[in-house]
Structures are given as C-alpha cells and as structure tokens.
Swiss-Prot record:
Biased composition (Pro residues): 918-946, 956-967
Protein name as it appears in the record: UDP-N-acetylglucosamine transferase subunit ALG13
Species of provenance: Homo sapiens
UniProt entry keywords in alphabetical sequence: Congenital disorder of glycosylation, Disease variant, Endoplasmic reticulum, Epilepsy, Glycosyltransferase, Hydrolase, Membrane, Multifunctional enzyme, Protease, Thiol protease, Transferase, Ubl conjugation pathway
Active site: 239, 242, 345
PROSITE patterns, A to Z: OTU, TUDOR
Effect on the protein of changing residue 94 to E: In DEE36; disease features include abnormal isoelectric focusing of serum transferrin consistent with a glycosylation defect; enzyme activity at about 17% of wild-type; decreased N-acetylglucosaminyldiphosphodolichol N-acetylglucosaminyltransferase activity
Length: 1137
C-alpha cells in the first residue's frame, strides 16, 4: 500500500492541510496509485475527517513522540520548511516536497528551502492561488519541469513525477510503468523560485548555433522558426536513443532514464500486442527484441505507446514555417514537444523562459559546487565571471567562417581536479541580450589569467545555459573519433591534430587544432590559439605545421609500453606527430649519436603526400628493435632470422641493427640483395633493395647524397659530383653508420691479376630532370657542423659479421648514356661507366655452388626483345634467343681479364663503354654455333636497340619511351582499377624494369678450379606448341633427404651421372606469360646472380621463348636454401609436380 505523509511540525499550517485534504486532491492522489494519506496537523484549526474505503484511507493526528515511523513508511513526504523535518526526511532518503508558509515572519523557511533546492535535495512551492488560471494550460512551458517558474500551476505542476523525486534527487529506482504519472497533490499550490525573473533580460539569440557550427540549412531554418514562436530546440545526443532521451528529460528533468523508458515501452507493447502488432511487418517478437537494443532507433509507433504509458500527447515540429503535427491525440492535457529532423533525430523543444530559468539554476548549482566542495573563494568566482564576460575582443570572423563561440578552452595546469577543456562546445543556448562582450574572444595578450576552464565559466554565468548532457555525449563521441581520420589531398587529418589555418584568401596562417570534422568531410572545425576562436574552415585552407628543421614525418610512433609499433590507419602519419611528442622523444629522434641508426623519410614539400606505405619503412629510435610492418602481409617480421643473434664487436657504440643487416623481409619473405657502392678505395657504402624501401648508408656531417628518390619515385644514385638534390619533394631514406677501420671490411682480394676500381657512380644511374633554381636545397643540419665540398669524413667500412665470410662481389658496368627513367623527358648524361656490386653473404647462400663468370664486350650476347610482337626475338651477331633450347657450353677462356677469386667465387660481368678508363680485355674464344633456329616468323616493326655496346645496327631506332611513373596516389585514382592489390603489383612491375637492366642472355664460364659437384638431372624438353604462349619451366625441387645431403657436402644430387659440360653456359630468360608487354625501349633482362641471396642460381632447363612480356627474375621462388619462401604462383608450376 503506497502512502503519502504530510507533516506541519508543532505549529499550524492550515493552508497546507486544506489544500491536501480537498476532494480533488484526494482524487488525484488516488488516481496516482496512492492508497493512504496520513496528515500530521499540529496546532492547526483545520481538522479533516478521517475515513477508510476499500481503495483509500485517510488518517489524521496532531502529535506523536516520533515521526520516524511514519516517515519510514511513506513513499512521499510533503512537509513544511522546518529544518528538523527536512533533515529528518532527507536522512531517510525519502522524496520530499517542501511547502513554504509565507505567513511566518522574515520568511526564514524560504531561505532554507532555497539552499536545499540549490543542492538538489528537494523541491519547494507555496500555497498561493493563482489569479489567472488560464496560464496553467499553456503548453509553452514544458510539463514536468519544476524549474520553470513562470506558470507552474496545478496542471503544469502535475507533471512532477514522484519517481523523479526518488530517482533524480536521491538516485533511487525509477517508478515502474504501472504508475508512471504521479502528479502533485494540491491544485492550489504554486511553485516558487527564489530569484525574480525579468522577461526582458533573457531574450534568446536568433538561430542558435548547432554544435560545432555544423548545422544544416534545415536545422538553421527550424531554429529560426521556433525562435519566432518563443521556443527553442535543446540538442539531444545524436544516437539511436534520442527519442527516449528527450522523453526522459521532459518527464524527469534528466536524460539518464532513457534506458528505463525504452524497457517500459517494450514491456507495454508486449503486454498490448493486439494493439501494436498490426503495424509491424514480420515477427512482432523479433521487432520488440530489436527495439530493446539501445542501438536501435524508435519511431511513431513507439511514440504512440509512450503516450499511453505516460499520459502525454506528443507534438512534433517537422518542417520550418509549418504548424506542428499532433502525433497522438488521446486527449491528455500534458504535452511533450519534440523537433523531428529528416534524418530521424529527435530534439526537445522548450520555451525560452525555461532556458532562462535553467541558466540561473545551473549557475547557482556550480557556485555551490565550487564554493562548498572545491573550497574556492567567492570573490575569485566573481572575478572569473567578470573576466569571462569582459576580457575579450570582437570576433571578427564570426559570420564569415562560422566561428562557433566567443570563448576558448584554456586549461589551467593547477585545475586538474576540474573537468577538462571542452574540445567542441555549442553556443545554441546563448541569450540575445546578455553582455555583448561575450561575443568577443579573450584577449590573447594574457590568457593565463583565466582561472577556470571555459565550460566551468560558462556554467557559472547565470546568463548562459550550458547543455551538460549534450556536452557529455559529445566528449564521448570525440573519444571514439580519435581512432578515425579524414583524408584530403593525400593527407590524413586526425581529430586533435595541430595544423595551420588560413582564414582569408592569401591571408596569414594561424596555429590551430582540429576540433571536429564536418558533416560532408569537406570542412573541419579548428580552434585558433592566437585568436582564441573556433572557426569552420574548408580543408583547402589547412596545411601541416611548418617545422623549424627539415625534419620529415615519422612513419610510425613506437609504443611506450611495448617493443612494437602502433598500427596507423591507412599507413600514413601526419607530419604534426612530431610536434605532439614530449621533449625527451624529440631529443631522442633529432640527436644523432655515433653508431645509432636513424630511419626517416623525407616528405614532399608543400603538403604533398608521402610515398605509399609499401615503399616506406618504419622508423625506430631508442632501444626498440628495428622492425618493419607490412600492411599487405598484416604482420611484423624482424630481420633477426637472417642475421646472427650475437652482438657486434662494436655494439657498445650504438644499439641499432647489425652493421651488415640493412635488409628487411620483403613481401615474398626473402631478404633483398645489397648493392655495394664504392666511392673510393677503402670505402664502401651499401644500399639495400627490396619490395618495400630503398635505403642507403648515410653520411655523418656531410651533405652528399648517396641515394635519392625523386618525386616520380624513381630510384638511383646521384652523379658523383657532390651536388645535392634540390627540393624537399624528393623522398630520401637514410640510416646512419659509424666509421670503421681498414680491417673491418678489407678490400677485395685479387687472386687472378690486377683489378681496377671503377669511378664511383652507379650501374643503375638514373637520369634526373634538373630542378629549377628557385627550389631550396636540402639541408640537414647537425650539431657538429657540416662537411666541406660534400666529401665523406669517415671511412665507410663495415665490420664483417663473425660467422659470415666476406662474400664475393658481382660487378658490372653499364652505360648510363641511354638510360632515361624520367617521365616525358629524356636525360642527357655523360657516357661514364659505373660500378654496382651485388653482395651476397656466403653463409646466406647456404650450400650453393657459386660459379665465377667473366663477360667481354666482343662476345655476342643474345638479347630478348620486348617489342610489340610477343612472339618475335632479336637476333644478335651469332646467337638467336630462339635457339636457346638447351644450355650451350663453350671452353673456358685461357687468357683475358683476370677473374677475382674469393671464398664465395664471385662472378664479374663487365661491358666497357667507349671512353672508359679501363683497357678492354682480350676476348675469350667464341662459343660453338648453336643449333639451327626454326623458321623465323614475319619480321616485326623495328624494336628498340638492346643495351649491349658491341651490338651494331644499320637502322636508326626510335627514341625509347619512358615507363609510366610510380603510383603514388593513396586513393588509388592513378591505377587502372584496384586500389590495394593492383597498386602493389603495378609498382612491383615497374620496379622490375628499373632494377633489372641486365642482358637477356649471358654465359657463365666454368671455374678454373674443379669443383666437387654431382651431375644435374636431365629434363626432356616439351614440344613447342605455340611461341606466343610460353610453356612452364621445370625446376629442381628439394626432396626429403636430398637437401640435407647437399647442405652437408656442398654438392647437389642429380638424377644421372653425366658430368657437367665445361665452357660457357647460356641461360634462357624466364618469361611471364601472364604479364603485360612492357613499354618499348626497355629489354627484359636477367642478372646472372639471383636477387635473393638465399636462393641458388637455377640450372637452365626448358626453352626461352621470344617476345615475352616480363621476366620473373633470376630464379624461381622455390623453397631452396635456408628459408622457405611463399609457394610459386599458380601459373609458374614445375612440370615435375
């Protein structure tokens, strides 16, 4: 049995007893589900007659020794404003309504009731009867809002729910849907608020700004329309529970009960299934199950159910300028006003006077909080409010750029206990008539004077109403947005990033922070520090923060707790990440210490995007192990598997990677080759090539560039003239090495005769288009000064690994006169011979028999053309590529250029160019004539000439066309179709052309030293069906037991006992039958030594077919050697499988 207890204490309060005991009040109490009313009348003259019926009981008495028992049994207490009664009731945790007796002297009860109400403990009112009852029926004041003091008559005040008193004031459970609408008992009582209100003082702002100034045109028009009606739209969290949040706020003065309201709605619809089932398509039970999910939105069917539950009719404002829609018309006096947008979102609609009253209440509450809880001096609060209102300047760009509010969020370092600064806040609730100074921003000259955060000052101001519920939701939403980003012009912008903003065309740039992303992802809301303003600006007006040093953007940020790297979405990191680091991290990155490796990638200038993630490598600093993150493979793999685990002898001077471990694992899980570069005697620099990135040993205190990547993403060494690259748009990657001594990496031994060091340029020299003189020169400043004349200060000798012997070097000289990789331009370079050496550690090669080779320029080398006709081949002087059905063997040379012998039997291939400083060696004996070729097909159009110097031709070939540039657009718009897979393989194909400028067919002379090897198996040649469709090659597969024998004896088992023939061996070119034909002017070519040091050279088996579109490489990626790579492609399967 639910009970209401009314007490007046020891005095008399006849007005209260008369109001409560009136017949209409008793009927109202009974209709609300209360079955008993207990009156403690004291010394009053009004004594109601007690009675008892089956449904209701009235008990009356004057005094008792103690009221604790009645208070404990009561579900609601209505009391006079005596201090003892109030405190005793609140101690029991009961909902309390205090009625003030205005006939007492000095009205001391009002002061006590005001203070307790400010602290949120109770509600209070008076018993005055209104002279204008018509105000009670006004729907302008939101029902259920005790704070609205304008017209809280019996009808309006009937919205006060007893469950509200229990849940809102004392955090008790909400009243169930069985008795949802408990109204106040006494019709003649009038709600009273302590501060008198002046209507002219609180004129609201026309067209309240939406949160972050991102209102749509329809929302702005709706706000203007509601303002003309004396209403305003209070924003509700934009989630699936917006309808239940709005109803909870209008019923219970808080949005925290939206989940209970949702559950009550589901329960009511389940109990009254016959009423609602006809409106639902499909299973009604499943519909209710989905409705119970907080992520499921609700509509008009739920509004009808809620109207029946809470005895409210719903009025919806849907279109600006049009009258509202009555969604329900059940005849209820109480109304709930909502605003419905086209996106299905619901907001609450209140009167402007409610907004004014709520602003005063909020200011009083925050004042009590800071004075009594945080013990802040009252004068300090007043000073802060005055400074908040007057200490700012006019917002000059408010109307143009959409500056959302007048104030900024300064965080005080000594206010950690206070709430954080709001990153984005709404000012839709600012009254029109309040101090115009608040439209201005705080003076940037001395912003540190603000003692409190902006949100606190906003809530302390009684003239501003802060939408706390919406602020809380917005903050939580922004936490989720931190993992998201938006992309513009190839650059990704994250919430909270620091940037520079231009407010006017060709105006100055201001430092700012990104606060919010626009609805259409074409604009952002930024907070400008200098102006202390928020502005909505297009993405075109943003640019990254300019660094003082030429410091590039880091590819990844290391995790503080772990040893790995954090995954960055999309593989790109904004350049402003560096600015967000603390001082220790910046010092650790920018300070170069001898022996440490610093990984960095120079970004494009003027906001251009970085290289795609597949061409970048992760940086590391500190003690984190260098690792590379593969976005395609989705895992992180270190190169420790391919290098010794013991430290280097000079590890004490640096803690980076081992000196000889500059390679990472590529996409096929194989280490790439290292290209050794010799700038001079006793000096060696390494550049490692793989499918991810190109890295070169960097210099110390020097500005000579060793390896560069121009902005077309084409790779090569710079000419050896000491000239620096111009422009930050050239993407460069370095890592630092320390100087060594002459014994760390000795010069290559000369076993067969004198060898000459070729001048220091690259076999892969790339003609680069000259930059305009207007571009700045790359300048990496270091603390210890710079080097004069761009020379190296130190001997770049790298200490050999203890368990690794110095491998042999395969050297070749390639002319760079006709190599032009620039897009749409030809490059003229001096015909200078260059040397590039591939260095393969002998231990990494496993148990592979190496063969030394020596090539002369007068020996004809067959070349496969990649011209337009796919089935044609270019015949050389004496050998045709179509004749290379089986490998041809010639006698080894007896004289000529000496071969450098090394423990790993290096192979040398030299093709001197005219004008080279090396004397031409004597030619070796010519190879035996090959078998007669098949009848050639009709001649194709003249293909581009091969790169062999000794080849002559009477026809003038057309100039070579440049290959297409690298794909660098992160959105993939420069690709044919695919944006992820195709971009990688497209660039990989181009890399193959840039990387493999070798002859299509080369010969390998037999070693002077007889090796203990077994014979190779003989494979039968499949019949040639069609030259346009090359057949699959066979390959030697590793079998169980055979590989172990081979690794132990340095031999390779064969199927027969026939010896390997002596002489030069001609290797065919492996073609890709599924690749596209390359551009004319570039021959598919093949290195003698494989690109991957862990895989041995393949023995020639099968036929080389002319006109192949692409080549695979030197070897098949089969499981040979010390690691097991990925299986070969489906179109390249050995015939023996």
């Amino acid at each position: 049995m639910k009970c209401v207890f009314v007490t007046v204490g020891t005095t008399s309060f006849d007005d209260l007893i008369a109001c409560v005991s009136a017949p209409d009040s008793l009927q109202k109490i009974e209709s609300l589900g209360y079955n008993r009313l207990i009156l403690q009348i004291g010394r009053g003259t009004v004594v109601p007659e007690p009675f008892s019926t089956e449904s209701f009981t009235l008990d009356v008495y004057r005094y008792k020794d103690s009221l604790k028992e009645d208070i404990q049994k009561a579900d609601l207490v209505i009391s006079h404003a005596g201090a003892g009664s109030c405190l005793e009731t609140l101690e029991k945790g009961k909902p309390l309504v205090v009625v003030i007796n205005e006939k007492l002297m000095n009205n001391h009860q009002l002061e006590l009731a005001k203070q307790l109400h400010k602290e949120g403990h109770l509600f209070y009112c008076t018993c005055r009867v209104l002279t204008c009852p018509g105000q009670a029926k006004s729907i302008a004041s939101a029902p259920g809002k005790c704070q609205d003091s304008a017209a809280l008559t019996s009808t309006a005040f009937s919205g006060l729910d007893f469950g509200l008193l229990s849940g809102y004031l004392h955090k008790q459970a909400l009243v169930t849907a069985t008795h949802p609408t408990c109204t106040l008992l006494f019709p003649s009582c009038h709600a009273f608020f302590p501060l008198p209100l002046t209507p002219t003082l609180y004129k609201m702002h026309k067209g309240w700004k939406n949160y972050c100034s991102q209102k749509s045109l329809n929302e702005a028009s709706m706000d203007e329309y509601l303002g003309s009606l004396g209403l305003f739209r209070k924003l509700t969290a934009k989630d699936a529970s917006c309808l239940f949040r709005a109803i909870s706020e209008q019923l219970f003065c808080s949005q925290v009960h939206h989940l209970e309201i949702r559950k009550a709605c589901v329960s009511y619809m389940r109990e009254n299934q016959q009423t609602f089932e006809s409106y639902v398509e499909g299973s009604f039970e499943k519909y209710l199950e989905r409705l119970g999910d907080p992520k499921e939105s609700a509509g008009q069917l739920e509004i009808r159910a809620l109207s029946l539950i809470y005895n409210r009719d719903f009025i919806l404002y849907r279109f600006p300028g049009k009258p509202p829609t009555y969604v329900t018309d059940n005849g209820y006096e109480d109304k709930i006003l909502l605003c419905y947008s086209s996106s299905g979102h619901y907001d609450s609609v209140y009167s402007k006077q409610f907004q004014s009253s709520a602003a005063v209440c909020q200011a009083v509450l925050y004042e009590i909080l800071y004075k009594d809880v945080f013990v802040v001096d009252e004068e300090e609060l007043k000073t802060a409010i005055k400074l908040f209102r007057s200490g700012s300047k006019k917002n000059r760009n408010n109307a143009v750029t959409g500056s959302e509010d007048a104030h900024t969020d300064y965080k005080s370092s000594n206010q950690n206990r206070m709430e954080e600064w709001g990153a984005c806040y709404n000012a839709e609730n600012i009254p029109e008539g309040y101090n115009k100074g608040t439209e201005e921003t705080k003076s940037p000259e001395n912003p540190s004077k603000m003692p409190f955060p902006y949100k606190v000052l906003k809530a302390l101001d009684p003239e501003i109403y802060r939408n706390v519920e919406f602020d809380v939701w917005l903050d939580s939403r922004k936490e989720l947005q931190k993992s998201d980003y938006m992309e513009y012009a190839g650059r990704q912008y994250y919430l909270g990033d620091k940037c520079q903003v231009c407010l006017e065309s060709e105006g100055r740039y201001y430092n700012a922070h990104i606060q919010e992303v626009g609805n259409e992802n074409n604009s952002v809301t930024v907070f400008i520090e200098e102006l202390a303003e928020k502005h909505v600006v297009p993405l075109a007006n943003l640019k990254p923060v300019t660094q003082v040093m030429s410091v590039p953007a880091w590819n990844a940020m290391p995790s503080r707790k772990g040893r790995g790297y954090q995954k960055m979405p999309g593989g790109y990191v904004p350049e402003i990440v560096i600015s967000e680091m603390d001082i220790k991290q910046q010092k650790k990155m920018f300070k170069k210490i001898r022996g440490k490796e610093v990984y960095m990638t120079m970004a494009y200038g003027k906001g251009d995007p970085l290289l795609p993630p597949r061409l970048q490598h992760s940086m590391h600093y500190g003690h984190d192990p260098p690792m590379h993150y593969s976005q395609t493979a989705g895992n992180v793999m270190s190169n420790e598997h391919f290098h010794p685990q013991h430290p280097s002898p000079r590890q004490g001077r640096g803690y980076g990677m081992p000196r000889n471990s500059s390679r990472f694992i590529n996409r096929h899980n194989m280490p790439g080759p290292k290209v050794d570069f010799y700038p001079g005697p006793g000096k060696r620099c390494c550049q490692s090539y793989d499918n991810f990135s190109y890295r070169s040993r960097s210099f110390r205190r020097s500005h000579r560039q060793m390896s560069c990547v121009n902005k077309e993403s084409q790779y090569g060494f710079t000419p050896g003239n000491g000239q620096m690259p111009r422009g930050l748009e050239e993407t460069i990657t370095f890592y630092e090495v320390e100087e060594g001594d002459e014994t760390a990496y000795p010069t290559l031994p000369n076993h067969g005769g004198p060898s000459t060091m070729v001048p220091a340029t690259s076999g892969y020299c790339v003609g680069r288009r000259g930059h305009s003189s207007g571009k700045q020169t790359l300048n990496l400043e270091e603390g210890n000064g710079q080097s004069e004349n761009g020379r190296y200060h130190e001997e770049y000798l790298y200490r050999a690994e203890p368990d690794y012997e110095t491998s042999g070097v395969y050297s070749t000289t390639a002319s760079t006169a006709n190599l032009s990789l620039q897009d749409r331009k030809s490059c003229s370079m001096s015909p200078q011979d260059t040397v590039t050496s591939y260095n393969y550690p002998q231990k990494m090669m496993g148990n592979i028999a190496a063969v030394a080779a020596s090539c002369a320029n007068n020996v004809p080398a067959p070349v496969l053309s990649n011209g337009a006709a796919a089935n044609q081949a270019i015949s050389t002087t004496s050998v045709s590529s179509q004749n290379a059905i089986q490998p041809l063997f010639v006698s080894p040379p007896t004289h000529g250029r000496p071969v450098i012998a090394s423990p790993s039997y290096p192979c040398h291939s030299a093709i001197p160019h005219a004008g080279a400083s090396l004397p031409p060696p004597p030619p070796p004996p010519p190879p035996p004539p090959p078998p007669p070729p098949p009848p050639p097909p009709p001649p194709p159009p003249p293909p581009p000439p091969a790169l062999d110097v000794g080849e002559t031709s009477n026809l003038q070939p057309p100039p070579p066309l440049p290959p297409p540039p690298y794909s660098c657009d992160p959105s993939g718009s420069d690709l044919p179709q695919d944006t992820k897979v195709l971009q990688y393989y497209f660039n990989l194909g181009l890399q193959c052309y840039y990387h493999s400028y070798w002859h299509s067919m080369v010969y390998v002379p037999q070693m002077q030293q007889q090796l203990h090897v077994e014979n190779y198996p003989v494979y039968t040649e499949p019949p040639l069906v069609d030259q346009t469709v090359p057949q699959c090659y066979s390959e030697v597969r590793r079998e169980d037991g055979i590989q172990a024998e081979a690794s132990a004896n340095d031999t390779f088992p064969n199927a027969d006992s026939s010896s390997v023939p002596h002489g030069a061996v001609y290797y065919p070119v492996m073609s890709d039958p599924y690749g596209q034909p390359p551009l004319p002017g570039f021959d598919s070519c093949l290195p003698v030594v494989p690109d991957y040091s862990c895989v041995p050279p393949w023995h020639p088996v099968g036929t080389a077919y002319g006109g192949s579109s692409q080549i695979h490489g030197a070897i098949n990626p089969g499981p040979i050697g010390c690691i097991a790579p990925s299986p070969p492609a489906s179109h390249y399967v050995p015939q023996g499988m």
